Amino acid sequence: MESRKIKIGSRGSPLALWQANWIKDQLESRNPDIPVEIVIIKTSGDKIQDVPLAKIGGKGLFVKELEEALLRKDVDFAVHSMKDMPIKFPFALCIASVTKRENPFDALISRDNIKLNDLPKGAKVGTGSLRRISQLLHYRPDLKLIPLRGNLETRIKKLETEGLDAIILAAAGLIRMGWENKISEIISPEILLPAMGQGAVGIETRKHDVDNQILLADMDDEILSLIHISEPTRPY
């Protein structure tokens, strides 16, 4: 009989691989007799970097190829940032575990550590999110919002290379990468309401693979799972 092996599907960005390796470590510590492998899968959202997400299908583009790999049984689990997940899933798949949440709010990184309220009139602020753009323009209609794509490192570099005054990113990713010192300000949810599931990592699998779901049972934050179910109903 062939020994059991778990394959985790992940995007290839440093943050995605940090999350996948964290899940791998959790699985291996709980199941030392089961080897775990990470399989890197490039998604449409990773391939298309020069067009705003809203124009090419939205944040679901970061999960499509991962879900296809699950359906083909190329991988057993797919690890996602929950903020990238669409509300609807393929019928044969499910989120089997939502892990403990990191800081769910958005963070400002600015030149000279300037806070949002202190940015000069007409300041150029980079972000790739329609959610952030609409809320920021409501709060500071004088700001000039610049489309921003790429992984965390790329977007942080663009603060310098594209002459931006500030950029806005999810705080959770910066914290996980050990870059808290780059954060100028955690933005209040009264100004910028975060995305559904922001800060949480979700593990997707096939509905009928009960044995695999059992492996994840004690990694699930039950309260957070209930919060995630309720968040799609929030007005934005």
Model-derived regions: residue spans:
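N-terminal hydrophobic or amphipathic helices and topogenic motifs
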Residues: 1-81, 93, 227-228
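Active-site-adjacent beta-strand anchor residues
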Residues: 9-10, 98, 125-127, 146-149, ...
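Phosphate- and divalent-cation-binding pockets in alpha/beta enzyme and binding domains
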Residues: 19, 87-88, 135, 155-158, ...
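Short beta-strand-to-loop elements that line the ligand-binding cleft
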Residues: 37-40, 143-151
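Beta->alpha turn/N-cap motifs
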Residues: 42, 81-85, 169-174
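A conserved helix-loop-strand patch within extracytoplasmic ligand-binding domains
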Residues: 82-83, 91-143
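Pocket-lining segment of extracytoplasmic ligand-binding domains
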Residues: 147-226
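Single conserved hydrophobic/aromatic residue that forms the stacking wall/gate
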Residues: 227-236
